[in-house]
Amino acid sequence: VKCETSDLLVPAHAEMVIEAEILPRQRTAEGPFGEFTGYSLGERQREVVKVRAITHRKGAIFQDISVSHLDHLLLSTIPIEANLYRAVRSMVPSVKAVRVPAPFTCYVSIEQRVPGQGKNAILAVLGADLYMKRVVVVDHDVDIFNDRQVNWAIATRCQPDRDITIITNARGSDLDPSTKEDGYTAKWGVDATAKPSLAAYVPRNQIPAKVWKRINLKDFLP
């Protein structure tokens, strides 16, 4: 269907169509408002948009987000994770998964074939996304969607003087309140993969599967 204020065609069943004009050379104060970092920003001069018309389908759904909370972060992390996965795979083909659990942070799971691939994965992430500041790389036997397992790998498979890489004076996000006034930031990566090989770290201490099968929670719960 045709717009209300122009000849532009838009989907007839769109949830909502907002027709507006961007006013050239005009600025006004915007804010304060929250950001994905979890901090609130003050006022800033921003462009002005004048809304000319709003139309919507019957029973339209308008989706809003709670700024800096999970629904806000999820919108951006999905495409970021896909981009980082491609970047790591070009350097470490045996990458298993990538997760962005928090602002400026990335977890990577790899099946390490040769020494040094953990560090290669770190550099791939930091080089692929300006916003990335902290990278943790673990072996494929560690679930990167479980923060407790990631911290366990850091505690038991990482020696700080050997396995932490720090890059100074790199460009980062201006939304990071810890960034230096000149816009530079330090970035760091943690190689929490097993060294010299995963074989030296197995078997992991786990309750045998046959024991779990013999346990019936009904015997212990009222």
Residue ranges and their predicted role:
Residues 1-222:
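Charged, compositionally biased interaction regions
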